[in-house]
Every structure is written in C-alpha cells, then in structure tokens.
C-alpha cells in the first residue's frame, strides 16, 4: 500500500516537473522568437519550398536559374513565392515537386503548407515557429521518458 502511494507521489512529482521544464523551455523559445529582429534565408526558403508554385528557389540558388538575374523582382513576386493563394491551397504536389529538388524530407513542408493553406494571402513567421515549438515540446517529453526508463534499468 505504501509503495503504491510512493509511486503515485513520484509520478505526480514527475508530471509537475515535466510541465515546469517544458513551460520554461517554451517561454525561452517564445521570448527568443519575439525578440528576433532578423530572419535567416532558411526561414524564407521554408515558406518558399512549402508554398511556391513556380520555382523552387526565388533567386536561383543551387540551380542557378538564369531568368531572374539582373531582373527587377517586385514585392508581389516575393509574396507569391512564400504565401498560398486561393488556387494553390492544399496543393501538395508542388510541395513534393519542390522537395524533390531539395535535400530535406517533405513532412515539415507539407505541415507548413497545410497551415498556410488555411490562411491564403497571409503570412506569419509564427506558423513555422509553431511547428518547431510543438516538435520541441514533444521531443522533450520523449527524451524524459527515454532517460527515466534508462535510469531505472541501471
């Protein structure tokens, strides 16, 4: 009986500990995202690879597309590259086509395209960050479970 109570207390303390640690990590991650003043090209490419209908890379990049060198590109060109619109919503064939020309697996980009498809002609850095934050929290839970089992087996 006492052993069962100890296990229940231990598991309650574990759950509280997990919640506190994940809350702290999420707070730190969100505060970093809020205070971020610039974005790296990979963040732009994530949206482009998830949503672009015309080309994988806006400025050629690895494939050196010659049709956009020394040519003025408007803000609308860039907007069309990173956003979905009514015609391109839930168009996963282009996500797979774009990823065939890239080196990363398509799951992240398919999820990002799905989120962007719910908000056509809109853009937010928080959509990609939300995916990363969710995966981060899930990873923390699984790491905790893994190491707690590993520690018990020792």
Predicted regions located by residue number:
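Membrane-embedded glycan-lipid processing machinery
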Residues: 100, 104, 112-115, 124-134
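Interfacial juxtamembrane loops and adjacent helix segments
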Residues: 51-104, 118-119
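Helix-to-loop transition at the C-terminal end of transmembrane segments
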Residues: 27-45, 62-68
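Membrane-helix interface segments
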Residues: 106, 121-126, 150-154
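Membrane-water interface at transmembrane helix exits
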Residues: 30, 112, 116, 144-152
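Start-transfer (signal-anchor) and selected internal transmembrane alpha helices
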Residues: 1-38, 148-149
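Transmembrane-helix motifs of polytopic, lipid-linked glycan transferases
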Residues: 126-151
């Amino acid at each position: 009986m006492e052993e069962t109570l100890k296990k229940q207390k231990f598991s309650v303390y574990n759950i509280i500990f997990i919640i506190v640690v994940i809350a702290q990590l999420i707070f730190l991650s969100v505060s970093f995202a809020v205070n971020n003043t610039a974005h790296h090209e990979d963040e732009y490419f994530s949206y482009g690879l998830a949503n672009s209908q015309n080309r994988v890379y806006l400025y050629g990049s690895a494939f050196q597309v010659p049709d956009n060198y020394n040519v003025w590109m408007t803000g609308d060109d860039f907007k069309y590259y990173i956003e979905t619109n009514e015609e391109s919503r839930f168009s996963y064939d282009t996500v797979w086509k774009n990823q065939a020309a890239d080196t990363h697996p398509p799951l992240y980009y398919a999820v990002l395209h799905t989120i962007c498809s719910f908000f056509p002609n809109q853009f937010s850095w928080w959509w990609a960050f939300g995916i990363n934050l969710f995966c981060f929290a899930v990873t923390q839970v699984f790491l905790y479970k893994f190491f707690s089992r590993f520690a018990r087996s020792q």
